[in-house]
Amino acid sequence: MSLELWLSLFVICLLGAMSPGPSLATVTKHTLAGGRINGLAAAWAHSIGIGFYAFITVTGLAVVLHKSEALFSTISLCGAGYLAYLGYKSLTATDGIASTLEKGEAVSIKQSAKEGLLISLLSPKIALFFIALFSQFVAVGESAGAKVTVVMTPLIVDGLWYTFITLVLSSPIFLERLRNKGKLIDQISGVVLIALAIRVVWQNAEYL
């Protein structure tokens, strides 16, 4: 995998992790309710779920691409529609990323890890996002090393982002800064997701 392609993957994974949603709300709840350790437990358990989705998506898409290019393109186009929808939602969001930062009830570290894992494994949004995203980074004949990179990148990026969130929530100064930049994060995410959707449609125009 080229550096340019990996950087594209990295940026999309980062924006995906930064997108406000139930995952952020869950990690936030456990951080504010149980402290830094609970937040980290939820964050990295969540990233393991992300890694699992990445693995099965890479494997499944590789098989589909090998057997049917038309079917793969259809999946890609459906994914493009979903990416465009996510981008639109981000651009039209009335509140920024900080709107999900709410306090929850105290829970054990084990419960924090469990909820962090389940919120990623049971989210249709995450499954659809990976189908849309990985259609751009999976290719027939891709080396095992490249596939490992594709799987590990979202896992590590997700874990590090929510680790950052956990640490930020321990500092009122940085929390306020994040609140102030929340709308900007939404807008950047929206533009990038819509741009990626347009790219997918362009690459699969012959099947329209």
Feature annotation, model-predicted:
Residues 37-112, 198:
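Membrane helix-loop-helix hairpins that form the core translocation module of multi-pass transporters
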Residues 1-4, 207-208:
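Short, strongly hydrophobic alpha-helical membrane anchors
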Residues 170-175:
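Short, flexible, glycine-rich and Lys/Arg-enriched loop motifs at helix boundaries
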Residues 67-98, 157-165, 176-208:
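Selective transmembrane alpha-helices of multi-pass membrane proteins
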Residues 3-73, 129-154, 163, 167:
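Juxtamembrane transmembrane-helix termini in multi-pass membrane transport proteins
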Residues 122-127:
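Selected transmembrane alpha-helices and immediately adjacent juxtamembrane segments
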Residues 7, 11, 106-118, 148-149:
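Alpha-helical membrane-protein architecture signal
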